[in-house]
């Protein structure tokens, strides 16, 4: 059982680490018509809304 808790802890830890490595752009709301533009500007011209998340391409 401790092994299972360890796996869950590692998965949660990696998820939090991945989330904190993003550039800190806010979520994409479908109610805002300018959300795609705001996401691009936040990411320095390389952002794209993917579902509720603004993802920055690191090129």
Curated annotation (Swiss-Prot):
Keywords attached to this entry: Chloride channel impairing toxin, Disulfide bond, Ion channel impairing toxin, Knottin, Secreted, Signal, Toxin, Voltage-gated chloride channel impairing toxin
This protein's domain notes: The presence of a 'disulfide through disulfide knot' structurally defines this protein as a knottin.
Tissue and organ expression note: Expressed by the venom gland.
Upper lineage: Eukaryota, Metazoa, Ecdysozoa, Arthropoda, Chelicerata
Annotated family: Belongs to the short scorpion toxin superfamily. Chloride channel inhibitor family.
Species this chain originates from: Olivierus martensii
Disulfide bridge positions per record: 25-42, 28-49, 39-54, 43-56
Molecular function per GO: chloride channel regulator activity; toxin activity
Signal peptide bounds: 1-24
GO cellular component: extracellular region
Role description: Toxin with unknown function in healthy organisms. On glioma cells, interacts with chloride channels (probably ClC-3/CLCN3) and MMP2 at the surface of glioma cells. This complex is then internalized via caveolae, thus inhibiting the chloride channels necessary for cell shrinkage and tumor propagation.
Subcellular location: Secreted
Principal localisation: secreted
Cited InterPro entries: Scorpion_toxin-like_sf, Scorpion_toxinS_Cl_inh
UniProt-listed SUPFAM superfamilies: Scorpion toxin-like
Pfam families: Toxin_5 (PF05294)
Full protein name: Chlorotoxin-like peptide Bm12-b
